[in-house]
Amino acid sequence: MAGTYSSTLKTLEDLTLDSGYGAGDSCRSLSLSSSKSNSQALNSSAQQHRGAAWWCYSGSMNSRHNSWDTVNTVLPEDPEVADLFSRCPRLPELEEFPWTEGDVARVLRKSVGGRRLPSFSAEAVRRLAGLLRRALIRVAREAQRLSVLHAKCTRFEVQSAVRLVHSWALAESCALAAVKALSLYSMSAGDGLRRGKSARCGLTFSVGRFFRWMVDTRISVRIHEYAAISLTACMENLVEEIRARVLASQSPDGGGAGGGEVSAEALEMVINNDAELWGVLQPYEHLICGKNANGVLSLPAYFSPYNGGSLGHDERADAYAQLELRTLEQSLLATCVGSISELSDLVSRAMHHMQGRHPLCPGTSPARQARQPPQPITWSPDALHTLYYFLRCPQMESMENPNLDPPRMTLNNERPFMLLPPLMEWMRVAITYAEHRRSPTVDSGDIRQAARLLLPGLDCEPRQLKPECCFSSFRRLDARAATERFNQDLGFRMLNCGRTDLISQAIEALGPDGVNTMDDQGMTPLMYACAAGDEAMVQMLIDAGANLDIQVPSHSPRHPSVHPDSRHWTSLTFAVLHGHISVVQLLLDAGAHVEGSAVNSGEDSYAETPLQLASAAGNYELVSLLLSRGADPLLSMLEANGMASSLHEEMNCFSHSAAHGHRNVLRKLLTQPQQAKADVLSLEEILAEGVEESDTSSQGSSEGPVRLSRTRTKALQEAMYYSAEHGYLDITMELRALGVPWKLHIWIESLRTSFSQSRYSVVQSLLKDFSSIKEEEYNEELVTEGLQLMFDILKTSKNDSVLQQLATIFTHCYGTSPIPSIPEIRKTLPARLDPHFLNNKEMSDVTFLVEGKLFYAHKVLLVTASNRFKTLMTNKSEQDGDSSKTIEISDIKYHIFQMLMQYLYYGGTESMEIPTADILQLLSAANLFQLDALQRHCEILCSQTLSVESAVNTYKYAKIHNAPELALFCEGFFLKHMKALLEQDAFRQLIYGRSSKVQGLDPLQDLQSTLAERVHSVYVTSRV
């Protein structure tokens, strides 16, 4: 027993006190951790020694019955397995999700490298859209728990949640997608209100709908827009990853170029066989990792020590070393262990390997990574003991220790194999929790959080904001420095206990900075007291001389655990974040700056103000208090020099309240009087000042109670943008009622929301307001989305007022320019006879019978005129020989046929006089006999005589008789006169009636295409 205890103690000492699992002086370094698998490289002699030397090489592998027994266990076909999963808690079934099946289909149709990819069946799309919900819920639940710490969800919480739920490979892919989307969003800051968030990020899924979904599910009381962008990008990237894997399985060469449609069965087969996808897409609350649907454990290629493509720097490495790497790979798949020493050794060796293969963090430049290399992650003793509690196996424990007899009876049921995650997943999740805390040490709390995620039926509270001292970070300090740090930790603990009578002793223990001492997280005792809402402690610390406006510093070796989003926060910020109004009142009374760190405004020290945080949370009392103390709602719109800035990622207070749907807070902010500051204009605003002043003054007198300053107008327009993006229609309309001018994108989003909610009174109001949008705003979005939306309304609405408003908009968009005229076809007939031979029996060699009357003609002219006449002549000769030369023509009147022949004999239309009543019939005959020039001439004559009464009939003729130019002209005529045409039953029957569909007509689609082309050419292309 003493030997066992000594071995365990030595292993724990190596694990917790060694220099970082992979440092250069480590006693157990794996120099060959980058070598590839030896499954193909090892020769037969090495295979023969598998049973001898291999097991003796590693200290954790010297037992007959160890963690290897759990690696390749074959799952028995037990009928209770299905029942086992049926008893596991399931994820909630939500009614709404931020995407539609159409959105998923569009992502699947996106081309890759210009290659056309196979399509997915409708059932496969429906199935995938449903499976994605589970992945979203998992990520959202983890982000929700991580957001408890600061009562705010940022991109850091979302990215950590993705890393918790997904494998290393998928998480890195999602992180890169998020970085790309955020970069595109930042680079398009100049298009702020002109384009939607998704368009600016290059995403198909709607960022606005994701933000609204995050608010509705209360992931946090504050959602940062970067968090919504990151989550949207990650979910879209997951669809693309699944598509790539499905297409790779369909293609023989793995390139995804296989033909045919991807079925739902093929999709499910790929997911069931993929250990990185199957568990994430299951309906159970606990996360199944590292296993596929068959229960087969697998190690992701990202972590495998054998996927480097080469044997490393020493290709002559002996077989034993390569087998050691293979041993490590298999050991990471262990689901239980027999002793704490075995677990310690496995974790130690795995950390050595991970330290040598630490990837570059997405979004971090190599230069910055070199300046600030990631700290090596260590494991505290309590973390190992907690992990062993979840991984211990009584049977293996008895076999490991010969002095320990197995119990005759057990009081606890063992977890079935299917519910046991491999060691690799325990480590991955625990390390992710530690890295999110910016801690260099995995502690027992990280293991408990991992157990909650990986095992069914377990739960624990999220981590709270409190002082955390990392003792392992003291290892490199000398005795004196370590003593000071231990005393500092003692001081924080004394203050954190809530006893005000210990303040003087605690301050003395904190060190030379006293009450303003900062811990590893960059926080002072006052900040912790404010976050906890301990009013008595806050008062005592203020009396002790605590600095009220000291800020959380940036990350540094002295403060290694600073959360990136908490930089430059003050004590007031923490009190506002956690909603402690009495503490906020106390701090303000004591002289804390109401704007937080904005007192030292600058790009490097920029942070959200307390008023912004209170506005985002919708805390009406806090907002009122801060406003009464002089907080400026427009502070984020200006930098220290008064210049407007679009470089910061933060929004103004109006935008925060509007983005989260807090209408009462927005109204309270609007009651704040406008400060009389001189507006600083950009060059563009200076050039447009004259026009804008007249517009603003007219709007201010008629639509708003007061004239808005230019700065407040911009702030409210930004708030209007966010409310429209996130679907808060009432807020958008209320801001419009104040006189805030429309932007085209805001108007389109508002119209879409009102239409989807069937609020036709708002639809009518929006349509009526379209004329207030400047024509300079018309862009590609109007062509691709706005017109589509308005024609959808036209198809479904039965409200005459709405239809009349739509007609007015279509006419306005078409413009006052004339309809493009139909061009003539300049075509000379191949043969020509003197008009004297028209219907002349002399020298005639063919006779037509039309309406019982004979018409004489000449073959030489007709055969060369069109293929239709040539076919008639040929067929008649073959059927009747030369005995009969009469060809009967039906469905054409005699005088129409005579005008047709007149065109042929005259050689053109110059000498022809066509009565208006006969134009359409002649057009039909010209189309029948394939006389293009005559048909085009008839089209031109029709366009010249087109009227509101004849337009519908002419359009039908043009469609039936294949006259596209005339049909296009009619569509332009419809758009120019739609308001009058809607009064006619014939036109309504054309666009709404079933007869149009029976005839193969889709006039609304044709009108939309014509108007889109017109708007694009007049308003979009002409500006380029």
From Swiss-Prot:
Cell cycle found in the keyword field: no
InterPro entries: ABTB2_BTB_POZ, Ankyrin-BTB/POZ_domain, Ankyrin_rpt, Ankyrin_rpt-contain_sf, BTB/POZ_dom, Histone-fold, SKP1/BTB/POZ_sf
Top-rank lineage group of the source organism: Eukaryota
Signal peptide residue numbers: none
Cross-referenced SMART domains: ANK (SM00248), BTB (SM00225)
Keyword DNA-binding listed: no
Keywords: ANK repeat, Repeat
ANK repeats: 521-550, 567-596, 606-635, 649-678
Domain BTB: residue ranges: 844-913
Example GO biological process: cellular response to toxic substance
One example GO MF annotation: protein heterodimerization activity
Cited function: May be involved in the initiation of hepatocyte growth.
Name the record gives this protein: Ankyrin repeat and BTB/POZ domain-containing protein 2
Organism, as annotated: Mus musculus (Mouse)
